[in-house]
Amino acid sequence: VGVPVYFQSVLSDGTAEGRREAFFLIGSFLALWIIAYGAVQAFAPRLLGAKGQPATETTRKAILWAGLLVPVPFLLAGAAWLAEGPSPLLTATLILGLLAFGFVFAVNSSVHSYLILAYAGSEKAAEDVGFYYAANALGRFIGTLLSGLLYQWGGLLYALIGSAVMLTACWLITLTLPDRRSDTRLGVLDT
């Protein structure tokens, strides 16, 4: 929530026309970002060389890629703190940071989608996957709500710090993923 609101504040001059132009610029950027995210997510299995690898190796990759996410919002929060307010340099830094974050997050998401299937029991895989996506939706809702509240309380800096803290918690939880099923070789990522 915080980043698009920040972009609106720096791209709009406050007039109706300025708000409209900013709206379409931000919307177009985010649409292209989502399309690129999907392309990276689709390509991630090849990028990771995931074909036929055991679930334990994929678990190690989940830990690695979740860990790679953590510094991005911390670095962006540092940039926001140093900028002490909106600036062209901060805006450019945020755009580059969003691109880097989107790439790493898309790979991470692909790995997690595989792992939910690898860890699901075959007799209740649909139920396990359903719970995963329900938890995912709830997490997105809480993240969106928290991001908006943090932006209201402390601007972009607080929203980015909140993101960094939540990603750190995610990474710490990922460290506890079991290495069971070390012999599992699902064809899910065989693309």
Task: Explain the meaning of each model-derived region.
Residues 77-80, 162-191:
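Multi-pass alpha-helical transporter architecture, strongest
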Residues 19-20, 88-89, 149-168:
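A membrane-interface helix-boundary motif in multi-pass transporters
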Residues 23, 120-132:
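Loop-to-transmembrane helix entry/capping segments in MFS-fold secondary transporters
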Residues 31, 35, 130-138:
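Transmembrane alpha-helical cores of Major Facilitator Superfamily
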Residues 107-120:
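Intracellular juxtamembrane helix-capping segments at the cytosolic ends
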Residues 59-109:
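C-terminal transmembrane helical hairpin of 12-TM major facilitator-type secondary transporters
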Residues 2-25:
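Short amphipathic helix-loop junctions that connect adjacent transmembrane helices
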Residues 26-51, 72:
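Transmembrane alpha-helices of Major Facilitator/SLC transporters
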